[in-house]
Amino acid sequence: MKDLYVVNCCRTAIGSFGGSLKNTPAAEMGAIVVKEALKRANVAPENVDELMFGCILTAAQGQNVARQVSIKAGIPYSVPAYTVGMVCGSGMKSVIEGARSILAGDSDIVVCGGTENMSAAPFASLDARWGARMGDKKLVDTMIKDGLWDAYNNYHMGTTAENINDIWGITRREQDEFAAASQQKACAARDSGRFDDEIVAVPVKVKKEIVEFKRDEYVKEGVTADSIAKLKGAFPVGPESPNPQVVHTFEVTGAQDAADKGTQRVTAANASGINDGAAAIVLASGEAVAKYGLKPMAKLIGWGQGGVDPKIMGVGPVVASRNAMKKAGVTIDDIDLVEANEAFAAQSIAVARELHFDMSKVNVNGGAIALGHPVGASGARIIVTLLHEMQQRPEAKKGLATLCIGGGMGTAVVFEKC
């Protein structure tokens, strides 16, 4: 197999829903990170062979968001670009597709990543074109419908997390402790400047001034498990408990401890946020690295995907990570750092149990519960965060990034530091 390298990567700071990035189009955010990633990689735009970029909420964003990103970033018209739509896995899927393009001999340098402005997702009238003659009409929230709603069981992603709670026996207290730890780690990392190297500033208008947005704004100070313990459950418990063994064999550890089985345990505090942001990754072949004298951050040594019952979509990373590690020829004991996207504390805990994570290596600077989850960008964002953290830790040689995907899927990638 050809050698595959991440030459450089970066991300925006993550904005809150309706926050600092609400008026910055997804394509604009994407262009900013692509331009900066190419600059850091010392790759001329004309040497890019293709751009592939994740974006889920594309309604009213204009044709092919990835092409907009490419042109706005100064990449020549002659370079093709396409938008990847694999729900939360879109940003990571773009990296997998970039790797495949290089392995196939179609490309030597590709730009991958993802962008999402959840704040800008429009409301839609589904019958206005042909049937809205008179009377009140319903508007559909495309942010929920296209990004956060299980199309197969007709309920919110939060209910899939409640399904996992019941099957894996995860308590409300466990989830609140997990969420509080994420917030505390993210606060410490942000305030100490741990994220500074991976973030590129985005100019935003505040009143009449243009200021640089470069600090993750969704992170909450002072969160403890006790401080969020009284929040009410946010999502209905699923009408039925699916059998996790239908597609794959899971250990389902802890199920015997389901003291609060059937109760609502997923809250606004132990679930990820609704957010805006973008991330970009420059991927190159070994030949391109040698030809242009590039200095890569890491080698991509394996990736994996997988599917599970949509009712328990949050455990998709278990299957994907096993496949990725098998392809890379490593075990979990070989992995020094893990970035596992925190869609919900429930699924994060289940994934950690099934994969036997050493939690001291997982999301060491917090995860999506604290930082936020701009859905089309998150798969790329966790790669950016993982690789930059590996650079700061001499002992970190190998890293795993993985995330769950609505509809019952997962993706994962394994890197080795250069």
Question: Can you say where each PLM-predicted feature lies in the sequence?
Answer:
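Conserved active-site "lid/cap" helical segment
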Residues: M1-Q61, V65-A73, Y77-P80, T160-R172, ...
